[in-house]
A protein has these predicted regions:
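Hydrophobic residues within beta-strands of alpha/beta enzymes
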Residues: 35-37, 104, 151, 191, ...
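Residues that form or immediately flank small-molecule/cofactor binding pockets and catalytic motifs
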Residues: 81, 156, 258-261
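Active-site flanking residues adjacent to catalytic metal/cofactor-binding acidic residues
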Residues: 6, 38, 80, 152-154, ...
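Histidine/acidic residue-rich metal-binding segments in metalloenzymes
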Residues: 55-68, 75-77, 94-99, 127-150, ...
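Divalent metal-binding pocket/active-site signature
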Residues: 17, 42-44, 99, 103-184, ...
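Charged catalytic cores and adjacent phosphate/nucleic-acid-binding surfaces used
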Residues: 1-10, 20, 112, 164-268
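Generic structural "secondary-structure junction" signal
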Residues: 84-86, 118, 153-156, 207, ...
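A metal-dependent hydrolase metal-coordination microenvironment
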Residues: 1-136, 234
């Protein structure tokens, strides 16, 4: 049975046109008890800032209206996915603090003001250099940001750039990965298992299984599962793989969130 989906995008995101009604009806059909809408909030990306603007007043008002509309069928959570960079901390955290979020994902979608997906960074760095720079930036982000619950798709850097950029150099970056995970744990923050990697032809979820195992080895406890769906058909996709993996390493729960606090739910 599917428990929830804590990474879903709607028509409020610059890269989705999916209606909220279709999202909630799909989640209800799948038997989910709660779902977090986590539309994109980004700031200061070269040539793309306007695409990622999120009208937080209208967004919050709308999600809370839908929460009331569907309250007898599913628990709708007000979430957001904040694309962070070291220099945008003050602006973005001040924005997040203004609203009654249940759940906040922090993600790194851009390095040095350039969107990783657009290919500019790959022109100047090979796979090894880019992955190293990415994890150095993620470490700076987790050290400085506080207004979030989980870090999204931590090894997202492998998604773009074509075949020669695929695959995580886990051992080569383990020093940085360990510092990132230890910082998250010390701040009582979690990670997500993001199942979109199967749809991006990497045949895995983000982050890789070694990284998830390491988080728990170091004492981490907070874990969410998200589809990163931008259309309703992807909600809950490949969650059975994530559930089976967690149980195989002795983790028998995932988290929901209420007013920024984790609620642990057993995987059945």
């Amino acid at each position: 049975m599917l428990i929830n989906d804590y990474h879903v995008h709607s028509e409020f995101s610059g890269d989705s046109q999916e209606s909220l009604d279709k999202i909630f009806k799909r989640a209800i059909d799948l038997g989910m008890k709660d779902i977090a809408i986590t539309d994109h909030l980004e700031y200061d990306i070269v040539g793309m800032t306007d695409r990622w603007k999120l009208d937080l007043d209208r967004y919050t008002k709308t999600i809370l209206e839908y929460k009331e509309k569907y309250k007898d069928q599913i628990d709708v959570k007000l979430g957001v996915e904040v694309g962070i960079q070291p220099h945008t901390r003050e602006h973005l955290e001040n924005e997040v603090k203004k609203y009654p979020f249940d759940f906040v994902i922090n993600s790194t979608h851009a390095l040095d003001r350039h969107d990783i997906a657009m290919g500019e960074l790959q022109k100047h760095m090979n796979k090894e250099q880019l992955q190293r720079h990415y994890f150095e930036t993620v470490l700076k982000n987790v050290q400085s940001y506080n207004e979030f619950n989980v870090y999204g798709h931590i090894d997202f850097i492998t998604r773009y750039g074509g075949e020669k950029y695929r695959g995580l150099n886990y051992k080569e970056n383990l020093d940085l990965i360990d510092e990132i995970l230890k910082t998250l744990i010390n701040k009582h923050k979690g990670i997500e298992i993001n199942t979109s990697g199967f749809r991006y032809k990497e045949d895995r979820f983000y982050p890789c299984t070694d990284l998830v195992k390491r988080y728990f080895e170091l004492g981490g406890e907070i874990i969410t599962i998200g589809s990163d769906a931008h259309i309703n058909e992807y909600i809950g996709m490949d969650f059975d793989v994530a559930y089976d993996f967690l149980k195989s390493i002795g983790v028998n729960y995932i988290c929901s969130f209420e007013k920024m606090q984790p609620v642990f739910k057993k995987i059945k």
